Structure formats: structure tokens, C-alpha cells
């Protein structure tokens, strides 16, 4: 019986899709703007259509899922229309990149119920919300306001006034390193794109941008440019036809990348993680502001190895079977990093240089030992000691840090707490600083 019902529902959905393509959704006939609560009746569902992005067949599957739940609750099947065939209307449930401004929200605005559930990740979350919290009765009233947000996508933070650049470090978690609690990169890419739109870092050092991230990241960067006018370009995404896990993103609508390069310290293979090659390296680039070419600076990005315990109890470099003492590991990583940073300082006298990275080393290592890369300062400690504006002060357990050398002023320092909404994307907290120089 259940199978028969599902077949029936699929047929109805397909028929509605076929009938709805190219048709206009019903408009608000009165044109009046209501100032009171939104009064919803189940028969009003007949006005709505589900508009899905035709870039990806997954969105039609999500439209079917939502239609199934609405039919089960109300006995109504909505028209399903491809975004390329849909005329904008107040009565839409939007799935994916439909050509409208991405909002990732369910709101009541101007007396109308507006639903836009964004990409595939937020679509799943919002569909659950709609069916459990909104479409839960034959009638209900909603006051004006916001009822659903993918909060990580909308927690906008403007850059501090008088800052030259916002520099961020972000480990976005390679699929191979993610446990079962995380979605695959093609889902999480939506959250990462939302973070870029909300926080708009100027230069971003990313770690663990693996092969799966490479498959989807450029597509989302293109969507950001189309929908928000923010242009991000990638630097050093690969090296010798191998993926560079520690690459750079930068806003090419604000800055020019004058030069870029990377230095590889070693390669390793690990079949267990399906990595044929993984490079340990420092990537860097020199930038200048488009509106002030004299403002030049460098950003370097790295990812330090972390130790693993093998069955015999020996500590090894990640991906290696060669035993190594913990202090030897730290010394090796810092010496490798110092070697390239010292060269960059010599070749760029007087130019501020900033280092982003996942150091797999908690804050006390730097604060207790007093070690920083050659002539560099730990920006979080510098911000604390100078009374700079700080939000979400980091715990001592995080591994992601920013360093700087040269003449600069910290306008703001922020740390994303990975115990809340941020954990949907990665197991690492992001960190950024607004800097003037």
C-alpha cells in the first residue's frame, strides 16, 4: 500500500511539474500591504509553487520530499517549477540558486509568508522546520519577523572602520578527515559560501581544501559573484597537478595578487585516507589594494602536521610510520615555517607579512614557550594586551592562529566558537583580524 501511495505521489508531482512549467504563480490580487499578523489557512497552500534550481537534480528530489510531507498533512500537491521557467511571485518556496537573492530564511514580510531555503543543506533543515513548526495545523497566525535562519549564513560582521584588510584562517575539513557527524563537502560548501558572504574576508588562508572541495568551491564562488557582486579568486589551488590543501582565497574586486608561490617541505601518501599525495608546505602571495596600490602586504598559509599514536605506541608524523618525538615534530614544523618566512622578510623589506594556519598546536605552546615565527607576533595575544576590540575570545585548546610582522594595527580580532552553529561546517574554529597598515 505504501509503495502504491509513493508511486501515486511521484506521478502527481511529475504531472504538476509538467503542468506548472512556464506558468506564473498566482499573484497577490489586492496588492495591499498587511500590517498585522500573517493569517495562514491550509487552502492557501494552493497558491504556492515550489521553484527549484535546475542546476542540480538533488533539488527536484528535495522538492518531492517537501511535496510529500505537505500532501501527507494537507492532501495538497504543489506545482514544481524549474527556476529557469518560473516568474518571481510572492507565493514561492525556493530551493537552491533560483536567481533570487539568497536569504536562507523563512519570514513574514509585508503581510506575506516568504520562504527561501537556499542550497541543499539549508533546504533539508528548512523543510524539516516548515513541516514540524509551521505547517503543523490547518490554520495559524505569524507576526512579522524571522522564523528560520541558517544562522551561520546570516551572522553578518562588517569590517571595522579604517581597517585595510580582513585576514582570516579557516580549516574547512577535508571529507577524508571528517567523521559521520559531518555532511560531505558538497553540502558543507553552502555553509562556507554563506560565511564568505556574511564575513567577507579579504584574504583567506584555507586548510584541508581537498579534491572534493575543489569540485564544488569554484561553483559557489561564481554564485557569490553573481548574487552579491563579491568576487573571490583562488591562488595555488594545485601544485604539480596535485591538490594543495593549504591554498589562498582573495577578493579580486578589492586587491591585486602581484605574485604567489609555495614551498613544499615533504610529500606523503596514505591509502587509508585515499590520498595518493599530500604536501606539507607554506603558500604565500603578495597583494596590493586596487584603490591604493601603495598599500602592499603578504599573506602566507600553512598546515602543521600533528602527531598520531600507532599500535606500537610510537608517536609519528600524520601519514607516516616513522617514529618522531613530539618536541622533534614541533621543532621540524617551526623550522620549516621559519625558513620560508625569513626569506619572505628579506625579499620584502618594510612590507607587513601575515601568517594564517592550522598549527595543530594549542595556544599555550606559543604563549608559554614564547615562540613565534621569526620576528612575528601572535595576533590574538597582541590584541588582548593592547585592549583591541575582541569578540568570542578563543579557548586555549584551539589550533588555528594568526601571526603578523611589520607595522600594522589590529582594529578587531574575532574567533568563531566551534561549539555552536560553526560546527556544522568543520571541527575547527575560524579566526580573523581586521588590520590597518
Segments predicted by a language model, with ranges:
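C-terminal motif of bacterial Sec signal peptides marking the signal peptidase cleavage site
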Residues: 16-20
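Acidic, contiguous N-terminal accessory segments
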Residues: 22-110, 114, 118-129, 133-157
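N-terminal, active-site-proximal structural segment of metallo-dependent hydrolase catalytic domains
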Residues: 156-222, 297
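Acidic/histidine-rich helix-loop elements
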Residues: 169-190, 266-277, 305-329
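Active-site environment of divalent metal-dependent phosphoester hydrolases
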Residues: 175-177, 211-215, 243, 307-310, ...
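Structured beta-strand-rich core segments of catalytic domains in phosphoester-bond hydrolases
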Residues: 209-306, 414-416
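His/acidic metal-ligating clusters that form di-metal
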Residues: 281-302, 313-361, 365
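Metal-dependent phosphoester-hydrolase catalytic domains
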Residues: 341-354, 359-437
